[in-house]
Regions:
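Active-site anion-handling motifs in enzyme catalytic cores
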Residues: 1-368
């Protein structure tokens, strides 16, 4: 029997790669696994094929040639900023014709209006779980039994931070995970360019402060081909050449938790970098540019470690805003000053979310 997964796969986004790595390990081994993979090719898929063999399908026309026991929308923000119209509904209905059961699994959904066609689409699912409270409230208006299990990467095994530190050793280390907020086209607008220059300056200021405290700085890009540009601009402003961590060289998907746990602190901007910090008990300054990051901190009781940066005004990012320098410094000092205060909340929260994802998968696979 066959299972089909779809998501943002093959886009060189570390967060989505982590979700896929977990999904590959969760689907029961005796099922033939198909993955809708419209972007990239065999080279991009090879690391995942090593985790578990699967058949790639590059178009919905190709996917429709098979029949599936279960069709899963597997994690991530699958409907972040598009207009879901009647054509999208028809496409979703046609895809569903190939499967006995359909499921939304740990997805994030940003409310958009009008939502009539999307509401009809939601009614076609046999099981729905989401990763945040906004998504749960949105879906529950149509499907009352929706589950908020949190992001699916919480289901990865929890690591022993003390053991990771012992294994890697060294002095104080801080990991910096920056998200490039603006495209090259956007930065042609002088107002946007000035906002970007301000952000670069703010990042260099706080990184300089951490260096003065004796921290060794490492950078970890999440969205390949984009985040490196932001990191490069920060490094150029600093006049530094600090290490940039590379997947395949410095870590693999199955060792990223051990690597993250080896750091004493972090400056985290990408959602999954904030998740990794909380999951691995790493006190961090969390720069939140969307609701899911803010909700993660709020649910964990760690809101005081976050500061909002509004990239642009829309349903996904909320209201546009820059960061206050004084508040930014205060949050950094809080993250670095008392690790135990962060860790005392992060560890039990990570344990609860881990169990929530495990319970979610048990419910999901009852459909099989």
């Amino acid at each position: 029997m066959n299972v089909l997964l779809t998501g943002f796969f093959g886009h060189r986004n570390l967060g989505d790669d982590l979700l896929l790595s977990q999904a590959l390990q969760r689907v029961p081994k005796h099922y033939q696994l198909y993955i809708y993979w419209p972007a990239g090719g065999d080279a991009e898929a090879l690391p995942f094929q090593r985790i578990r063999p699967f058949t790639m399908v590059h178009s919905w026309k190709e996917a429709l040639r098979h029949r599936y026991r279960l069709f899963i929308y597997a994690g991530g923000g699958l409907f972040p900023s598009r207009t879901f119209g009647v054509r999208s509904l028809i496409s979703g209905l046609l895809q569903g014709l190939t499967a006995r059961h359909k499921a939304l699994n740990g997805v994030g959904i940003v409310p958009k209006q009008p939502r009539r066609w999307f509401d009809l689409f939601l009614r076609t699912f046999d099981y729905c779980s989401v990763r945040d409270e906004i998504s749960r409230k949105f879906v529950s208006e149509i499907t009352p039994n929706v589950v908020n299990c949190g992001d699916l990467y919480w289901g990865a095994p929890l690591k022993d931070k003390a053991l990771c530190l012992k294994n890697i050793g060294g002095g104080k280390k801080l990991v910096v995970c920056l998200a490039n907020p603006f495209s090259a086209t956007e930065k042609k607008d002088i107002r946007i360019q000035r906002r970007y220059e301000l952000l670069v300056k703010q990042m260099t200021t706080i990184i300089t402060e951490t260096k003065s405290l004796g921290y060794l700085i490492h950078y970890m890009p999440f969205y390949m081909g984009s985040d490196e540009k932001f990191i490069c601009d920060v490094q150029n402003f600093l006049g530094s050449h600090d290490k940039i961590l590379r997947q395949g060289k410095d870590y693999e998907l199955d060792t990223i938790d051990q690597l993250f746990a080896s750091y004493d602190a972090g400056i985290c901007m990408r959602f999954h970098s904030i998740l990794l910090a909380v999951k691995n008990n790493v006190p961090c300054l969390a720069i939140c540019y969307d609701h899911k990051s803010e909700q993660l901190l709020q649910e964990a009781g760690l809101s005081e470690y976050g500061i909002r940066y509004g990239i642009r005004t829309n349903e996904f990012f909320g209201e546009e805003c820059d960061m206050d320098d004084t508040l930014l410094r205060q949050v950094l000092e809080r993250a670095l000053g008392d690790p135990h205060a962060f860790q005392s909340k992060a560890l039990p929260f990570a344990q609860r979310k881990h169990q929530a994802v495990i319970d979610n998968y048990e419910q999901l696979f009852q459909l099989l």
